[in-house]
């Protein structure tokens, strides 16, 4: 069994050694330009077209939860990967726990009005504020995949009203489910905190625009943990400046790194992190990949395969 590995920033030596230990029967090598030797599996992140084109592979693993970079290249270069080759994403590998930590900490930050108290501190004002009530702090999660379910599970224990919106209806205990475009408005109207965990597909690009934001409750909050292209940033600024949105926490942006001239940097009600909400944990990723490859080799059922048409 031959395995190709490519990642532009990871510690390649660590990964190759870990994969060799987890799959002792495999020959693992780093892909380099000009390598056209046969391989059975490819483990990649933002792979060059040349790496995959023309290969007869059993499967390709994206080294992250999203596969949009591969799918976008496939649109421009369909010869890069035959339709018959299964494409897998990392289902969790520790990212769910990280998303839970991020979402819970930010929701509680807003609920306890720490953003307001920081603003008062900046003005040297000692002013206790009325507390929010949980029943008035409904949380809506857009995207009901593995990460969405993890976030909902972690927030449920705090007693907030929870709702989710996705392509198909879910049956999560304690979470009100909305499905399809026809139910999006009803989902938004009672949402105070909007958490975006949607996949990156042609249908979801630009979905968080002024029309959508205006349907939220007044003084709403936005937490974007998915992709920057989901948010129309100019519309977000309008909603913040006219008071519809009280605050936004952004981990992802339409352009990364975020340009220095972006008004988001200096907006007083925007907080941000540099795309670190959930990162690949190498040891857990190797365990998932090796387990999946072993099951594929035995012809056993596996999870994590991407539907190329849906984009996730």
Curated annotation (Swiss-Prot):
Residues forming the catalytic site: 227, 275 (proton donor)
Similarity comment: family membership: Belongs to the D-isomer specific 2-hydroxyacid dehydrogenase family. GhrA subfamily.
GN (gene name): ghrA
EC numbers, comma separated: 1.1.1.79, 1.1.1.81
GO cellular component, one term: cytosol
Gene Ontology MF annotations: glyoxylate reductase (NADPH) activity; hydroxypyruvate reductase (NADH) activity; hydroxypyruvate reductase (NADPH) activity; NAD binding
Keyword list, A-Z: Cytoplasm, NAD, NADP, Oxidoreductase
The keyword NAD appears for this protein: yes
Reactions catalysed, as given in the entry: glycolate + NADP(+) = glyoxylate + NADPH + H(+); (R)-glycerate + NAD(+) = 3-hydroxypyruvate + NADH + H(+); (R)-glycerate + NADP(+) = 3-hydroxypyruvate + NADPH + H(+)
CDD domains in the record: GDH_like_2 (cd12164)
Known role: Catalyzes the NADPH-dependent reduction of glyoxylate and hydroxypyruvate into glycolate and glycerate, respectively.
Subcellular location: Cytoplasm
Predominant localisation class: cytoplasm
Membrane-spanning intervals of the chain: none
One Pfam family of this chain: 2-Hacid_dh_C
Superkingdom classification of source: Bacteria
Protein name as annotated: Glyoxylate/hydroxypyruvate reductase A
């Amino acid at each position: 069994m031959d395995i190709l590995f490519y990642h532009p920033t990871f510690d390649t030596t660590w990964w190759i050694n870990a994969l060799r230990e987890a799959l002792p029967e495999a020959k693992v090598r780093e892909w380099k330009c000009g390598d056209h030797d046969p391989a059975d599996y490819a483990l990649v992140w933002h792979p060059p077209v040349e790496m995959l084109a023309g290969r007869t592979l059993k499967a390709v693993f994206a080294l992250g939860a999203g596969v949009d970079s591969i799918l976008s290249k496939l649109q421009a270069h369909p010869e890069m990967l035959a339709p018959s080759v299964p494409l897998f994403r990392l289902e969790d590998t520790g990212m769910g726990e990280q998303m839970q930590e991020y979402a819970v900490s930010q929701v509680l930050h807003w609920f306890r009005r720490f953003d307001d108290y920081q603003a008062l501190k900046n003005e040297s004002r000692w002013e206790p504020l009325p507390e929010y009530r949980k029943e008035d702090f409904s949380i809506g999660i857009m995207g009901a995949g593995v990460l969405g379910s993890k976030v909902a599970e972690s927030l449920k224990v705090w007693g907030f009203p929870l709702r989710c919106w996705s392509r198909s209806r879910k049956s999560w205990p304690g979470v009100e489910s909305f499905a399809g475009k026809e139910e999006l408005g009803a989902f938004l109207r009672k949402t105070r905190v909007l958490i975006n965990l949607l996949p990156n597909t042609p249908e979801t690009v630009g979905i968080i625009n002024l029309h959508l934001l205006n349907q939220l409750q007044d003084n709403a909050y936005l937490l974007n943990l998915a992709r920057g292209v989901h948010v129309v940033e100019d519309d977000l600024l309008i909603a913040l400046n006219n008071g519809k949105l009280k605050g936004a926490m952004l981990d992802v942006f339409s352009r990364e790194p975020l340009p220095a001239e972006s008004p988001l940097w200096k907006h007083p009600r925007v907080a941000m992190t540099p795309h670190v909400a959930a990162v690949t944990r190498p040891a857990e990723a190797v365990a998932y990949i090796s387990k999946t490859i072993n099951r594929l080799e035995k012809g056993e059922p596996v999870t994590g395969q991407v539907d190329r048409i849906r984009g996730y």
